[in-house]
Amino acid sequence: MKQLIRRLSRVADSTQYSLLRSESQRGRTKKEKHKSWVPEGHVPVYVGHEMERFVVNAELLNHPVFVALLKQSAQEYGYEQQGVLRIPCHVLVFERILESLRLGLADRVT
């Protein structure tokens, strides 16, 4: 899992990486972006120092890569953090992780 995160970090830092937009930004108007509505079966998470909001499928939280990210979150922010779920990860790396999970690539790398 750590190996996958390291590999994705290197890819995110490369100049060939094209920026992926978060699911919360795809195909939505400005008015819709500010809503706090979350579809059933999904969880909002805030990523990185920028606190960029992502809406991810709750089933992903059990994936080993996400478990590793959640452990990092617990180490950095503690288990008693209130309010939002924060992930201490660069936004570009997180977007790359989501894309890899979506394409089914994360299982092959771990």
Curated annotation (Swiss-Prot):
Q: Does the keyword Cytoplasm apply?
A: yes
**InterPro entries attached here?**
SAUR_fam
> What tissues harbor this protein?
Highly expressed in the steles of roots and hypocotyls.
The record's section on Pfam families has: Auxin_inducible
Q: Name one GO cellular component term.
A: cytoplasm
Q: Is the rRNA processing keyword given for this protein?
A: no
The UniProt entry's GO biological process terms, in alphabetical order, are: auxin-activated signaling pathway
Q: Which UniProt keywords apply?
A: Auxin signaling pathway, Cytoplasm, Developmental protein, Growth regulation
Where does the UniProt entry say this protein principally localizes?
A: cytoplasm
- Family of the protein in this entry: Belongs to the ARG7 family.
Query: What function does the entry list?
Result: Plays a role in the regulation of cell expansion, root meristem patterning and auxin transport.
- Please identify the protein, giving its name as recorded: Auxin-responsive protein SAUR71
Q: Which organism is it from?
A: Arabidopsis thaliana (Mouse-ear cress)
